A protein has these predicted regions:
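N-terminal alpha-helical interaction blocks
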Residues: 1-122, 313
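Short Pro/Gly-enriched beta-strand edge/turn motifs at strand-loop
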Residues: 56-60, 161-166, 235
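Unchanged
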Residues: 67-121, 210-298, 303-307, 314
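Cys/His-rich short segments
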Residues: 131-184
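A generic structural signal for well-ordered coil/turn residues at beta-strand boundaries
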Residues: 142, 177, 186, 199, ...
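Short glycine/proline-enriched turns and hinge-like loops at secondary-structure junctions
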Residues: 158, 175-176, 204, 247-248, ...
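N-terminal strand-loop-strand
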Residues: 161-204, 209, 231, 255-257
Length: 314
């Protein structure tokens, strides 16, 4: 992935230290280590703070004593870079807090921030920590019971799996792959779509989940035909990033109209996509003030900027 195709949530400066997850004394060692820091999370949001010399806020990692109780603890790993007061090698534990515990840590709700709003401006370390933490927290929130028998499950491996002691089923964090594509025609125009529930001037590239038994390339061809009514070829992988809402992996591609098919008319499916349209670079630039495009934290925006030849907003 080139620097020109910037994916904020693909960044990471974390050694996940997975070999320690099976250590039965893992958290005893972490709590006795004075370097250990806690990433507090409440309702999918974390604490940020301003740091002198840095234009963007940074994650506010807490001392162990500052977070006495939590609904969930997960060992995220060790940092691999120095940042602020935390040297490389700092162990970080996610602590998911209930409302009362979150209020005790930080009562001002305006100091808790979500990943969608802040992810594009975070450092490599912080983007990796926040993305990883939110994805694993969402997994635990939706997998509290065994999928086979319905009995409650318990957390194992430092927070990285759940086990049902009724039938011994072990469940690992779920990741749902989805393709997202910038389709270009022979004139160099990009294909964008708009959902019926969106504002009329909101546009994005087309995307969809990969189905069972389906390759990524096949998913690209199928989704574009289903949502826009056109056939594509020359499918090329560009990059991927986590999208932990709740636990997707967005896999980005480019594709071109299939020249073997001949003239093709755009036909939105009118279920997910209400309208589709070809945009030239000149049209995007001329209409930019009135267009709502995906936020910079998303791979959708990265695909559009990549096609445009740089940041559309300069």
């Amino acid at each position: 992935m080139s620097d020109a195709f910037n994916l904020p949530l693909a960044q990471s400066a974390i050694d996940r230290d997975y070999l320690q997850r099976d250590n039965p004394e893992l958290f005893d060692h972490l709590w006795s280590n004075p370097l250990t820091r806690v990433l507090a999370m409440s309702e999918g949001k974390v604490l940020l703070h301003e740091v002198a010399g840095h234009a963007e806020p940074q994650l506010r990692l807490l001392d162990i004593e500052a977070v006495p109780s939590a609904q969930l603890r997960v060992y995220l790993g060790k940092t691999t870079v120095d940042q602020g007061d935390e040297p490389a090698g700092t162990p970080v534990v996610l602590a998911v807090l209930g409302k009362n515990s979150a209020d005790a840590v930080e009562p001002n709700v305006e100091n808790w921030h979500g990943l969608r709003a802040t992810g594009a401006g975070l450092s490599e370390r912080d983007a990796g920590l926040f993305t990883q933490a939110l994805a694993i927290a969402n997994f635990h929130e939706t997998h509290k019971h065994c999928a086979k028998c319905g009995m409650p499950t318990v957390i194992e491996q430092g927070g990285w799996s759940r086990r049902c002691f009724n039938d011994q089923t072990q469940t690992f964090p779920r990741t749902d792959p989805a393709i997202i594509v910038s389709v270009v025609d022979d004139e160099g125009r990009i294909l964008l779509g708009s959902q019926g529930k969106w504002e009329s001037n909101r546009w994005s590239v087309l995307a969809g989940f990969v189905e069972a038994g389906e390759s990524l390339t096949a998913a690209v061809i199928r989704e574009i035909y289903e949502e826009a009514g056109v056939r594509v070829s020359d499918v090329q992988y560009l990059g991927s990033q986590s999208w932990p809402f709740p636990y997707s992996l967005m896999v980005g591609f480019t594709a071109r109209l299939d020249p073997a098919v001949g003239a093709q008319e755009l036909k939105p499916d009118l279920v997910e996509i209400e309208k589709v349209r070809w945009f030239s670079r000149e049209e995007i630039a001329a209409e930019r003030a009135n267009l709502i495009l995906p936020p910079k934290v998303s791979i959708a925006r990265a695909l559009i900027d990549h096609w445009f030849g740089g940041d559309i907003d300069g």
